[in-house]
């Protein structure tokens, strides 16, 4: 009927010229709950060589969150943060999207994103599957098999009508229906 509000970050102009946008958290990248391969795809979007390999960054994120003092490969716990002059890990899931910048090495790894882009990309909510109808392009890129041509097609299609199921989305793009690969 034309009175629906999109939850994909589309800008609106309200009364008095106020501009606003709404974004569904389930369309964002769930940093606390994503598998390593998906975290790697997020990091790869920076497109530049990182001083710290993705595997080490992911291990550091997991060590930042876990409650033990055991080290994963190329990672660190509280003593490593203290030696680097940083606040120690919380040993809890991240509380805000910007907290990722406190995990050793992630500030440099995500330097291709502004703070606003981090907030527009990452959520700390328990998001398992991505809402493909509200996810920004940066989040859709982490789907296995997604390329720029498929991304453009998906975004153009959902502007006209939403995908009714995840299966319809994957079939439309010619991708395997599993979002939990590889």
PLM regions: where:
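Compositionally biased linear targeting/interaction segments
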Residues: 1-182
């Amino acid at each position: 009927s034309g009175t629906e509000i999109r939850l994909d970050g589309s800008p609106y102009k309200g009364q008095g010229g106020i501009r606003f946008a709404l974004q569904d958290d389930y369309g964002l990248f769930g940093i606390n709950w994503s598998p390593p391969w998906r975290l790697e795809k997020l990091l790869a979007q920076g497109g530049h060589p990182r001083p710290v390999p993705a595997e080490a960054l992911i291990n550091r994120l997991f060590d930042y969150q876990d409650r033990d003092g055991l080290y994963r490969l190329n990672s660190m716990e509280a003593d490593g943060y203290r030696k680097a002059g940083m606040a120690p890990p919380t040993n809890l899931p991240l509380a805000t999207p910007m907290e990722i910048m406190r995990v050793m090495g992630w500030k440099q790894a995500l330097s291709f994103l502004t703070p606003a882009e981090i907030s527009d990309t990452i959520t700390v909510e328990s998001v398992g599957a991505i809402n493909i109808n509200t996810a920004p392009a940066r989040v859709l890129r982490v789907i296995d098999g997604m390329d720029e041509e498929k991304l453009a097609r998906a975004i153009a299609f959902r502007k006209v009508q939403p995908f009714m199921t995840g299966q319809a989305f994957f079939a439309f793009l010619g991708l395997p229906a599993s979002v939990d690969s590889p």
